[in-house]
A protein has these predicted regions:
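Glycine-rich phosphate/pyrophosphate-binding beta-alpha loops
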Residues: 46-79, 158-163
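Predominant activation on well-ordered alpha-helical scaffold segments within soluble catalytic domains
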Residues: 15-26, 42-46, 60, 64, ...
Length: 181
């Protein structure tokens, strides 16, 4: 939705995926035999994949990849942990898209400024992450500050990183990892 390659068609898929994740994720996690919720999540991941396969990703995935490769942290967990932190970082570059995210997550209120909608979207993502049991700090996964330089070195050259809507450097990525620690 906010990658450099995003366009109207990919946005349509991503917004629908966000709506479906908002609707089905908690039920799928806490009621694993709920076929409707599991199907909803399967469709959501499929349409999200259709979008990002055509427009690329950004620094969330670029930073998640080394967490998995070096520390064997599941990719979904790494992405979910990093997502609100990177959303905060990227918000100034895509405020209009964050309004759409807030609407898709049903946290947009009429009259909100773009900045307020962005904050509501980030808060909603973080709250959903907490509710489904995602660790909120890399330290909970055994990552130490001494590991961060190695992670940032890998993340800055990751194939996904250049798609980020805001330019990043190794130093910025290191700071983002520190915020996640």
């Amino acid at each position: 939705l906010i990658t450099k390659g995003a366009w109207e068609m990919s946005d349509m898929f991503e917004i629908k995926a966000i709506e479906m994740i908002t609707r089905y994720l908690e039920t799928a996690v806490f009621e694993p035999t709920n076929a409707e919720a599991r199907n909803g999540m399967a469709v959501a991941q499929y349409i999200a994949g259709m979008a990002f396969s055509n427009v690329g990703l950004g620094v969330v995935h670029g930073m998640a990849h080394p967490l998995g490769a070096i520390f064997d942290i599941p990719h979904g967990v790494a992405n979910a942990l990093l997502l609100p932190i990177i959303m905060e970082f990227n918000a100034p570059a895509a405020l209009d898209k964050y309004v759409e995210i807030a609407k898709a997550m049903t946290v947009y209120k009429e009259g909100m400024s773009q900045e307020e909608a962005a904050r509501a979207a980030v808060d909603a993502v973080r709250a959903l992450s907490v509710r489904v049991g995602i660790p909120q700090h890399l330290s909970e996964l055994g990552i130490k500050e001494s590991d961060l330089d190695k992670l940032a070195t890998a993340a800055i050259v990751d194939v996904c990183t250049p798609g980020n809507p805001r330019e990043v450097t190794k130093e910025i990525i290191l700071d983002l990892y520190k915020k996640a620690l």
